[in-house]
């Protein structure tokens, strides 16, 4: 289980992102993460914390001042450490997912055969958010890449992408996650 939150504002989005992500705390107990994009410095800022021994608020409140920007995404996840930040031919982006992918091992082997690599291992397993990001960057643009994800995965996936231009939200046709 898990839940995510995204926001775009004309002023700093940090407080909205913090409280919006915290609102999803009942959906997961393992990890929480937030990422913002600061257009002024052209930087993505990210933080991920383990929530198994403490609450989201406790883990993130002290470090809120480091987040800058008018757009951001956050997640409460029972699976992978997220968000992850990718630099690709599509541009830089942060991604969070809530997913249950039945054919993850098959897709992992296909991507490895294409000379792709996985850097975000989680408990010795492939981070499904990174796998989804690698499927996205196979597209000619974000829309084509997201369509590639939904053509290839067996299961369910909802996602938020934080790009330099804003937020892209997508879910599978069944909307199960």
Give residue ranges: language-model regions.
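Conserved short alpha-helical segments that host acidic/polar catalytic motifs at enzyme active sites
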Residues: 1-177
């Amino acid at each position: 289980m898990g839940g995510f939150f995204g926001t775009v504002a004309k002023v700093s989005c940090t407080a909205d992102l913090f409280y919006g992500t915290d609102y999803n705390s009942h959906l997961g107990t393992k990890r929480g993460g937030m990422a913002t994009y600061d257009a002024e410095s052209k930087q993505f800022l990210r933080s991920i914390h383990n929530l198994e021994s403490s609450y989201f608020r406790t883990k993130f409140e002290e470090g809120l001042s480091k987040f800058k920007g008018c757009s951001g995404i956050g997640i409460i996840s029972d699976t992978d450490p997220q968000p992850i930040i990718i630099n690709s031919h599509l541009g830089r982006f942060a991604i969070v997912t809530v997913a249950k992918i039945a054919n993850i091992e098959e897709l992992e082997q296909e991507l490895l055969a294409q000379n792709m690599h996985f850097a975000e291992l989680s408990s010795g397993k492939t981070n499904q958010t990174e796998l989804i990001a690698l499927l996205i960057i196979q597209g000619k643009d974000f829309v084509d890449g997201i369509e590639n994800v939904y053509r290839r995965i067996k299961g369910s996936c909802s996602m938020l992408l934080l790009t330099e231009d804003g937020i892209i939200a997508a879910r599978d046709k069944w909307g199960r996650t």
